[in-house]
Amino acid sequence: MANLRKTHPLAKIFNNSFIDLPTPSNISSWWNFGSLLGLCLIIQIMTGLFLAMHYTPDTSTAFSSVAHICRDVNYGWLIRYMHANGASMFFICLFLHVGRGLYYGSYMLLETWNIGILLLFTTMATAFMGYVLPWGQMSFWGATVITNLLSAIPYIGTNIVEWIWGGFSVDKATLNRFFTFHFILPFIITALAMIHLLFLHETGSNNPSGLSSESDKIPFHPYFTIKDILGGMLLIMLLMLLVLFFPDILGDPDNYIPANPLITPPHIKPEWYFLFAYAILRSIPNKLGGVIALIMSILILAIIPTIHNSKQRSLTFRPIGQIAFWSLIADLATLTWIGGQPIEHPFMMIGQLASTIYFLILLVLMPATSLLENKLLKW
């Protein structure tokens, strides 16, 4: 009798995705982040579900309900901080996952890459709406500032903003709909992640050399299942270290002040994982220009496969390309730092410079280094 794992309609899908999947034998720990993102998503959905049981999406009780979760619900503080810091872990894994894709040329798997970009946008939207829910000062003013950006759209902008708000300012209706969307989006992310995997398994994984690995594949289980379990344990250790010892280190103290539409916080800034994009937004004096730059800072990832002109797929054997890549990482770190600083000299100027360099590296320097390396190798 044939193995049930290989014949049963449902088990067969699972088998071909996680057990008998032919995998390149040389994929490094940089390939662990896909499974870590899956783990993060599961943690976020589980903790979020339990938080939603006790949370009330109403302006008069939202802040109190979060305090109630932390004080009165059994292990509520643990669930709340796991959810808040889980989001940070999610974005750390996301950025490393995208960085890996850029370094090793995984963007050549077009469908997988484009769905990945869609996943990134959806996750950013989910995180933004989740940040509004505790209804602290930074929640309220963050929601006001970011939703207001849509008013930059010519002619219909103001109507769109008021439509999203459900009134003439961020209020009860806004909080309620943000809770609704924040609840539904993770399930949409799960569906997109499945499609992401579906397309990846059509072509098979890339590998650190950037060369074809058709001649050297090994089964996913047990080799990579055990490797992913190790990665997952390390992730949970790091998350619990944050949750149990430094739960508020990545948050903003202003969010422990209940939302007050009459008092503006001295510095309105998003969570750390949005600071690079926020710095790019602020570095352009024009509102519409800033919004376009903000969207393009992520959407530029979709252009990268079209401007890839190297004869090699990966940066493994391209030292000049590596310099460009690590310059980009340094530039993103600079943007993240600038995003958290007040808008004054010299931060404003550094931000504008770093924003310009960001787009220049991706659109000019990286293709230029590729051409130079092709020439040096007489290709």
Swiss-Prot record:
One GO BP: mitochondrial electron transport, ubiquinol to cytochrome c
Q: What are the transmembrane regions?
A: 33-53, 77-98, 113-133, 178-198, 226-246, 288-308, 320-340, 347-367
Where is it mostly found?
mitochondrion
Where is it found, in Gene Ontology cellular component terms? mitochondrial inner membrane; respiratory chain complex III
**Where does it localize?**
Mitochondrion inner membrane
Q: Name one Pfam family in it.
A: Cytochrom_B_C
Q: Where does heme b b562 bind?
A: 83, 182
The cofactor named in the record is: heme b
Which GO terms label this protein's molecular function in UniProt? metal ion binding; ubiquinol-cytochrome-c reductase activity
How this chain sits in the membrane, per its record, is:
Multi-pass membrane protein
The entry assigns this protein to a family as follows: Belongs to the cytochrome b family.
Quaternary organization: The cytochrome bc1 complex contains 11 subunits: 3 respiratory subunits (MT-CYB, CYC1 and UQCRFS1), 2 core proteins (UQCRC1 and UQCRC2) and 6 low-molecular weight proteins (UQCRH/QCR6, UQCRB/QCR7, UQCRQ/QCR8, UQCR10/QCR9, UQCR11/QCR10 and a cleavage product of UQCRFS1). This cytochrome bc1 complex then forms a dimer.
Task: Briefly state the protein's biological role.
Answer: Component of the ubiquinol-cytochrome c reductase complex (complex III or cytochrome b-c1 complex) that is part of the mitochondrial respiratory chain. The b-c1 complex mediates electron transfer from ubiquinol to cytochrome c. Contributes to the generation of a proton gradient across the mitochondrial membrane that is then used for ATP synthesis.
State what protein this is by name: Cytochrome b
Origin organism is Idiurus macrotis (Long-eared scaly-tailed flying squirrel)
